[in-house]
Amino acid sequence: KVASITPVVVDAETTSLILGITIMYDSSSTTYTADQITSLVSTTVSNYSASDLQTFNTPFRHSKLLGLIDGTDTSILNSVATVTMAKLFTPTLSTATDYRINFNNKFYNPHSGHNASAGGIIASTGFYLNSVTTTTYFFDDDGVGNLRIYSLVAGVRTYLNNAAGTVDYTNGLVTVGSITITGVAEVDGIISTQIRITAIPNSYDITPVRNQILEIDLTNTTYNGSVDATTSTGV
């Protein structure tokens, strides 16, 4: 008798990568403007995301993408790209709930208390508490492993809770302690039911784990094309 095999369907869990790309190019060797160069590069990035990512077990290779960007046009001399990881989670409204947002990649934390005064390396889109929509709250971290909740008052971070959860920098895990979220602010100017959490990785090479799939966030990735000063001045 042959034992039957029951397939297990695993839901994909997407981690988005928000890139900040700067391209230096030689204006004397092309008829393209800076905007046209960045448009070409954006197509390269989109093609890379579609061909090399968006499936299981396909890592993001930072150096490979930079090589593709540099090869987009012969006038491009070099490029740099920062990487921020992002995940969405859907809060259970008006019910005390805790949440685990697992990036499965180590977070950047070069020393205890890193960047605490400016919000650490964790950020989020907005949400509401106590059914009050006149005050928007956000998450950040203190660089020592505490997740914080704050609002902006005259542009200054004002903290409601300095211990709203934990940040595990080594394992890339954000844990939100029991919280009653009553509403969600817009995400990218669009009405949303989800909150986006972002984190700066320790390495720009990102590896998916288990059911994790990587993709580039083409909406929030930014491009800056600049004429290389050396080629334009000869100095």
Segments the model singles out, each with a brief description of its role:
Residues 72-87:
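Short, well-structured beta-strand/strand-turn elements
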Residues 10-18, 58-67, 84-91:
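A glycine-rich phosphate-binding loop feature that marks nucleotide/adenosyl-phosphate handling sites
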Residues 114-160:
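Structural flexibility/helix-modulation signal
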Residues 143-145, 152-235:
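Surface-exposed interaction regions enriched in Ser/Thr/Asp/Glu
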Residues 21-27, 103-105, 199-201:
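Flexible glycine-/small-residue-rich
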